[in-house]
């Protein structure tokens, strides 16, 4: 707990991308050690004990203390903790083994079968084969698998 990390994409052709927040939305971008400090900070999260389930995790933005990745209408975004039970559930994810060796899948605690997925540079709580474009089954397993990397920002 309380470890600073960066999450990297595992999908072939996109492994140079990492999860970050930008203008209150989660997305993926090409960010590395040589990128500007603001971008590296946006791609660094502090792993916290899950707000809704202490056996799971919440990801707090390292550069915006008190703000967490959460899903709202399935879109993953960064919002300040409002103290509500709904926020706590939206911002809690349980780590499961990912499709790639050593990767992790982040399963939503309050959206059945939904996992944090990158899709067209955006990040969603997606269900394999669900009704939305971001739920498409093609590359789903890879798209919901993330590499835990050393934090890009100290």
PLM ranges: what are they?
Residues 1-154:
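Lectin-like carbohydrate-binding module/patch detector with strong preference for beta-trefoil
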């Amino acid at each position: 707990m309380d470890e600073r990390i960066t999450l990297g994409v595992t999908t072939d052709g996109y492994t140079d991308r990492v999860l970050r927040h930008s203008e209150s939305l989660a997305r993926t971008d090409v960010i590395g050690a040589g990128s500007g400090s603001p971008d590296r900070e946006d791609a660094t999260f502090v792993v916290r004990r899950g707000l809704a389930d202490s056996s799971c995790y919440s990801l707090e933005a390292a550069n915006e203390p008190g703000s967490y990745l959460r899903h709202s209408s399935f879109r993953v975004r960064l919002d300040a903790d409002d103290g509500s039970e709904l926020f706590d559930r939206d911002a809690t994810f349980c780590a499961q083994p990912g499709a790639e060796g050593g990767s992790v899948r982040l399963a939503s605690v309050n959206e059945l079968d939904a996992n944090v997925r990158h899709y067209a540079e955006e990040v969603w709580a997606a269900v394999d084969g669900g009704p939305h474009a971001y739920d498409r089954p093609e590359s789903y397993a890879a798209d919901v698998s993330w590499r835990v990397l050393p934090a890009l920002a100290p």
